[in-house]
Structures are given as C-alpha cells and as structure tokens.
From Swiss-Prot:
Probable component of the PAM complex at least composed of a mitochondrial HSP70 protein, TIMM44 and TIMM14. The complex interacts with the TIMM23 component of the TIM17:23 complex. PANTHER family: MITOCHONDRIAL IMPORT INNER MEMBRANE TRANSLOCASE SUBUNIT TIM44. Essential component of the PAM complex, a complex required for the translocation of transit peptide-containing proteins from the inner membrane into the mitochondrial matrix in an ATP-dependent manner. Recruits mitochondrial HSP70 to drive protein translocation into the matrix using ATP as an energy source. It comes from Arabidopsis thaliana. This is Mitochondrial import inner membrane translocase subunit TIM44-2. Induction: Up-regulated after antimycin A or rotenone treatments. Belongs to the Tim44 family. The gene is TIM44-2. The lineage of its organism: Eukaryota, Viridiplantae, Streptophyta, Embryophyta, Tracheophyta. Residues 1-44 form a transit peptide.
Length: 469
C-alpha cells in the first residue's frame, strides 16, 4: 500500500499543468502582500515614532509651550545683537587707548627734550661760571704778587674786595668758600671715604675677587703709643673642672681606698711592666734584624704608610696658618708676577721689598750695578703671563717652601748708554719659563702685631727661553 501511494505522488508531481497551477497560486499570494511601489502594505512602525507623534500633537495643542519656544528664539536673537555690540565697543576702546598712548609718548618725548636742553644750558652756564671764577682767582693772585712788590693802594684793595664779593655771589663761589672751612672739609671727608670704601667692596664683589686676607703682602698696624706693662710675676691659677670631672675624681678616690682595689692594682703592676719589657724586646729585634724578608716588609710599610714630603709640608703650612688656601695663593702670585718682574728688570728695590726676601733683593741690586757699570740697560716689556701652577711643596729646614712654575711672553731688548740696541729688539718676543721658590715667613719675624705668617719670594730661576719672533 505504501509503495502504491509513493508511485502515485510521483506521477502527479511530474505533470506540467499541475506545476503551473501551483506556481500561479504562490505568485498571487506574494502580489497580494505588496503594493504598486513594491513595498508591503502591512508595515509595522517602531515605538519611538509613535512617541514622537504624541509629543508633536501635544506641542501643537498646547499654546503655552509655543509661547515659551517663541520667547527662547527672541532671547537668542537679542544675545546675538549684544555680542555684536560688544565687538564694536571693544574696537572703539582699543582705538581710543592707542591714540591716548601715542599722545602720552609724544608728550614724554617733548618733555625729555626740554629737560635735556635745560640741563645742557645749566651745565654750560656752570662751566662758564667756574672758568670765570678761575680767571678771577688768577687775576687776584697776579695782582697780589704785584702789590707785594710795589705796595697796594686803596683803589686796588677796593677792586679786590668788589671782585671777591662778585665771586661769592655766584653759587660756585659760595660752595667753594664753604668747603674752604676746616670743619666742613672734615665733615665732607668722612662720608667720602666711607663711600669710596663701599664702592671698592662692590667692585671686588662684581669682579669675583672679594677682598680677603692676602698671603704675600703685610701691612703693619700703626705703632702702639700707650704704656706697656713690664711686670713678669708668675701666678698659679687653679684649673676649672666640670661636674663630670669632679664626680669621676671623687669616685676614683673612693675606689682607691678599698682593699680589693689596692690588691688588684698591686697585681696588675708587675703584669704591665712585664708586657712592656716584652714589647720593647720584640721592637728591638724587629728593628735590628738582618733577615732580608724583614727588610722587605719594612720597606713596603714605609712606602705604603709613610707620609709624603708634600703632605708633611702642607700639614705644617696649615698648622701655622689655618686659613691657608692654595687657589687663593696661586691667584695672588699671578697678580704679583708682573710688578715683581718689572721691578727686577729696573732694579726697583722699593717694590721688591713688598714681595721678595732680603737675599733676592741683594742679588738684584748687585746684578743691576754690574750691568750699569758696563753700560747695559734692560728695556724688557712683559706681555702675557700664563700657566701658573704649583710644581712642588717641600721643607727647607723648618720652614715650608712652595715652588711655583709659570711662563711669560716678553719683549727682550738690551740697550747701551746712548740708547742703541745691543741685543734683541723691540720686536723680538721670547717665551720665558720661570720657577719661583716661595718661602713662608713666620709671624714672629714680622713683628709683635702680626697674627698670620706671609710668603716671600726666596729664589727666582729662569728655567728656559724660547724665541717666538
């Protein structure tokens, strides 16, 4: 039965007429759902569209809402008008301010020109008055000189008095007469000196080299004119002890009074003595040993732990002068090179006394005498100083010595008595290398009032000369 039904269905579906009918039914069903424009007639709207329609309907039906909307539009238009008015007003105010500024600037320029012209006129008038006053003073001095030889008459006296009164009538004459009095001159000198000192301090600060204690120059204070005591009595003064020291001494005295402490001290004394003897024996054997290994260890110890010569000299310098500074010392030497070399070439012993020792001054004077006796004169000129550096520091006896090396460029020229060039020339430039030995002079050698030691040039050596031109 089932097979028959299947065969029947297949035969029915294969018929062409039946297929056409089924197709027409399907097309008709589709066309019934679509309109002429191709869209379906039954369209479903969203929830938002319906909500917007309701709001529009309520707005159209509500007259108050329409009034508020109109008011908002009117206010917006008014605000736009206000903005335009503000723009116009700002432009007008800026133009007015610019015009006022130009007017003020022109007025200031005119006033400045007037002031400058008036100042120039006053200055020229003052200079003329000063010149006239000087001329009057010269004429008065000439008249007084002539009158001293021939005797002054009454008419000449009246002329001098009238000239002096005319001079005193002027402003500068009054000022000059007021300054001539000793009281006013002293009153003016004090603030002037104070102002000069202040200006010097400000200049030093601006240049970067503020006034410090100098290491090379020493200006002794004025001598003491008062009475000095000659009494040499010795007075014993008790030492002041603090509270802790007093408590410690009282505790130590109490402990020494106990018998236990006495026994311990008696037992410790032989032990301490024996240990000291053993340590001394070991030290003697170590120092007097002939073993090469011991000698090598001693040499290594000396090389590593021994203080160098420069360190010991610098330590001695700081012990004598705690405020010593190497950079300041080098800068002072660089400033002193030019005057010292110029004074040495000219034989100026007065200038050399400020910087050099007695031995170097004596050598300079002897050399200068020898050259002048032979008719030679040095016409050197120092051009440039550079590369000032500390070369070495060492001890010379008990005084420290610092060796400074620098180089200069100078014109080498030697003349005779007639001024003729014997050696070198005005255009011969040499590079000269110098070594200076600066020795520290103790404060006791300078005087009683000296607090810190100073440095003196003990020896000067020309290490080499190189011709440039």
């Amino acid at each position: 039965m089932a097979s028959r039904k299947l065969v029947r269905d297949l035969l029915i579906t294969k018929q062409p007429l039946l297929q056409q009918l089924v197709h027409q039914r399907r097309v008709g069903a589709r066309l019934g759902l679509l309109q002429g424009n191709g869209f379906a007639s039954h369209r479903r709207f969203s929830v938002f569209s319906e909500f917007s329609k309701k709001i529009r309907g309520e707005a159209d039906s509500n007259p108050e809402f329409q009034k508020t909307v109109k008011e908002f539009k009117e206010r917006a238009e008014e605000l736009q008008g206000v903005k335009e008015d503000l723009k116009v007003r700002t432009k007008q105010t800026t133009e007015k301010l610019y015009k006022q500024g130009q007017g003020v600037w022109t007025e200031a320029e005119s006033v400045a020109k007037k002031v400058s012209s008036s100042v120039k006129d006053k200055f020229s008038a003052a200079t003329e008055e000063v010149k006239e006053s000087f001329k009057l003073g010269k004429e008065e001095s000439a008249e007084s000189a002539s009158s001293s030889g021939t005797g002054t008459t009454e008419g000449e006296k009246q002329q001098q008095q009238s000239g002096s009164t005319e001079e005193q009538d002027t402003f500068f004459g009054k000022f000059k007469s007021s300054i001539s009095s000793p009281k006013l001159s002293e009153a003016f000198h004090k603030p002037l000196d104070f102002a000069k000192k202040g200006l010097d301090i400000v200049k030093d600060e601006l240049r970067g080299n503020p006034s410090k204690r100098k290491h090379l120059e020493y200006t002794p204070p004025p001598p003491f004119t008062g009475e000095r005591s000659t009494r040499t009595e010795m007075v014993i003064m008790p030492t002041k002890q603090s509270k802790w020291q007093k408590k410690w001494e009282s505790l130590r005295e109490k402990m020494q009074g106990y018998p236990v402490f006495k026994r311990l001290s008696g037992m410790s004394e032989p032990v301490v003595n024996k240990s000291q003897e053993i340590a001394e024996d070991v030290r003697e054997k170590w120092e007097t040993s002939d073993n090469p290994i011991v000698h090598k260890i001693q040499d290594m110890n000396e090389r590593i732990f021994e203080e160098t010569g420069s360190a010991s000299t610098y330590k001695e310098i700081r012990r004598r002068d705690p405020s010593f500074s190497l950079p300041d010392f080098v800068s002072e030497i660089q400033e002193a090179i030019r005057p010292v070399l110029n004074a040495y070439s000219k034989g100026d012993a007065k200038t050399l006394k400020k910087y050099c020792s007695k031995e170097l001054i004596e050598r300079c004077t002897a050399e200068h005498r020898a050259f002048t006796s032979q008719g030679y004169f040095f016409d050197h000129k120092l051009l440039h100083v550079s590369e000032v550096d500390i070369q070495e520091t060492k001890m010379m006896g008990t005084t420290p010595v610092i060796i400074v090396r620098f180089q200069t460029q100078e014109i080498f020229c030697v003349r005779d008595q007639d001024g003729k060039i014997k050696e070198g020339g005005q255009d011969t430039i040499h590079t000269v290398y110098y070594d200076w030995a600066m020795q520290q002079v103790d404060a006791a050698e300078l005087g009683e009032d000296a607090i810190y030691p100073i440095w003196r040039l003990r020896e000067m050596l020309r290490a080499g000369v190189q011709a440039l031109i």
